[in-house]
Amino acid sequence: MASSTQTNVTIAPKTLQQLRQQDAVILVDVREPLEFVGEHITDAYSLPLSRLNPSQLPQAEGKTTVLYCQSSNRSGNALQQLRSAGVEGIIHLEGGLLAWKQAGLPTVKTKNAPISIMRQVQIIAGSLVLTGVLLGSFVAPGFYFLSGFVGAGLLFAGLSGTCMMANLLGKLPYNQIKD
């Protein structure tokens, strides 16, 4: 069911699916291209939040544009940005792709898609922490600093919502997806 407040409009996954079957909505995925390639809702357009431009937003007469992301945080931000730019007739998916999948609704998964940025961050951060602990234990205690540095970076990422390691990894050639 769609709900409305002055700053936010959401739609539940099951309601969105009903509207999709009636061809009454346009879906826009605001996650990054690498995430979109890995898995997305059928017939969704990719328009990453990092490159959000109101003039590129797909819209059609008589259809509601529905934004979504992984959990609805980025789509909520995109909704606010678009509304501030004067765009009307947009809402976002409550709970994002996670809620969509939890409701048992279908997605498109790309076989052999690259590992998600967040999994890459977890692999690298875990490896650096383990390396720092092992080197600190068996080589020199100064290597514990490496584990502490990574821990501080993860703490900052959690508190700020900005992960510098993810930003850097996203710039690597193997993480670049052509739109």
Swiss-Prot record:
| Matches recorded under SMART domains | RHOD (SM00450)
Q: Where would I find the Rhodanese domain in this sequence?
A: 21-109
Q: Tell me the domain of life.
A: Bacteria
Membrane-topology descriptor: Multi-pass membrane protein
A family per Pfam = Rhodanese
Classification via InterPro entries: Rhodanese-like_dom, Rhodanese-like_dom_sf, Thiosulfate_ST/Rhodanese-like, YgaP-like_TM
Q: Which GO terms describe its cellular component?
A: plasma membrane
Q: Which residues cross the membrane?
A: 115-135, 138-158
Compartments where located: Cell membrane
Q: Which Gene3D superfamilies match?
A: 6.10.140.1340, Rhodanese-like domain (3.40.250.10)
PANTHER family documented for this protein: RHODANESE-LIKE DOMAIN-CONTAINING PROTEIN 15, CHLOROPLASTIC
Q: What protein name applies here?
A: Uncharacterized protein slr1261
Query: Per the UniProt entry, what species is this protein from, by scientific name?
Result: Synechocystis sp. (strain ATCC 27184 / PCC 6803 / Kazusa)
